[in-house]
Amino acid sequence: MRSTKVIHIVGCHAEGEVGDVIVGGVAPPPGETVWEQSRFIANDETLRNFVLNEPRGGVFRHVNLLVPPKDPRAQMGFIIMEPADTPPMSGSNSICVSTVLLDSGIIAMQEPVTHMVLEAPGGIIEVEAECRNGKAERISVRNVPSFADRLDAPLDVTGLGTIMVDTAYGGDSFVIVDAAQIGMKIEPGQARELAEIGVKITKAANEQLGFRHPERDWRHISFCQITEPVTREGDVLTGVNTVAIRPAKLDRSPTGTGCSARMAVLHAKGQMKAGERFIGKSVLGTEFHCRLDKVLELGGKPAISPIISGRAWVTGTSQLMLDPSDPFPHGYRLSDTWPRDE
């Protein structure tokens, strides 16, 4: 088979959300930091288009690129590529990356527990993997510092009127709204409507509320997180949530960065304190087990250090190739499966 490039990929999903991992065939992008490298990937778009667009990818797919770490504390770095964004951090993708690193032997597995330090674009993350019989069975990640930004802010959304929302950062930026406010329930049969309304809310939040990270060059709201009320049993809170990802799809997992942002909001509202746990449930019913580990400051703002825990499974291996006569070297997107990102 002739090809001008060959990219080696290990397929993976974390609690339902695809997070494939490039393990070979791509040189590290330019940049002095992993953050700068991720900005190159985002602005250049060549790799993003090749692996995410049809016919090699699809709107459902996230892909992670392994890179040598820049921080001496880390064993590996990774850059996350989502359908419309190249984010600072992702819970489900970090769980996929950790699982692939251990299950494939790229990093030596130690049973029953392997400790790793990885470098995401958003910063260093500590990983604890519960391992048995050559399989990383559960991954726990200390996420980057997370914080609430705006609480109970009014937001005008076409077709919905004025709704009350929170905004927060949990490794990525979110506008958070209760499902009852928009007349929805979080269930598979409403996935299309949830995704479309969520993207509309995200657009309105960027126009009316905005967001600015105190330390990173991250100046927009990426996602809408739609939630149902939390319940409490002792020191454990449980809540269903789903995240609308541009151009308009739902995260199949409970969204680790979303759970972190939600815990930051719960803490800011006095509804959760350090040491308490949160179980986030996805639209599929899968779970991330989270903990508000400690309270800290980030750039003068109150913040939390969250830990997120979930499972991932390798789904296969593949090689992406490009024949020199292929008319679609950058792929393509059609609005039947790639919703219009307006």
From Swiss-Prot:
Residues binding substrate: G91, S92, D251, G256, T257
Annotated catalytic residues: S90 (proton acceptor)
Gene3D superfamilies xrefs: Diaminopimelate Epimerase, Chain A, domain 1
Keywords: Lyase
GO molecular function, one term: trans-L-3-hydroxyproline dehydratase activity
Annotated EC: 4.2.1.77
Catalytic activity: trans-3-hydroxy-L-proline = 1-pyrroline-2-carboxylate + H2O
Enzyme class per UniProt: lyase
Keyword Signal in record: no
PANTHER family per UniProt: BIFUNCTIONAL TRANS-3-HYDROXY-L-PROLINE DEHYDRATASE_2-EPIMERASE, TRANS-3-HYDROXY-L-PROLINE DEHYDRATASE
Family: Belongs to the proline racemase family.
Chain's role: Catalyzes the dehydration of trans-3-hydroxy-L-proline (t3LHyp) to Delta(1)-pyrroline-2-carboxylate (Pyr2C). Displays neither proline racemase activity nor 4-hydroxyproline 2-epimerase activity.
Name of the protein this chain belongs to: Trans-3-hydroxy-L-proline dehydratase
Native source species: Brucella suis biovar 1 (strain 1330)
Lineage, opening ranks: Bacteria, Pseudomonadati, Pseudomonadota, Alphaproteobacteria, Hyphomicrobiales
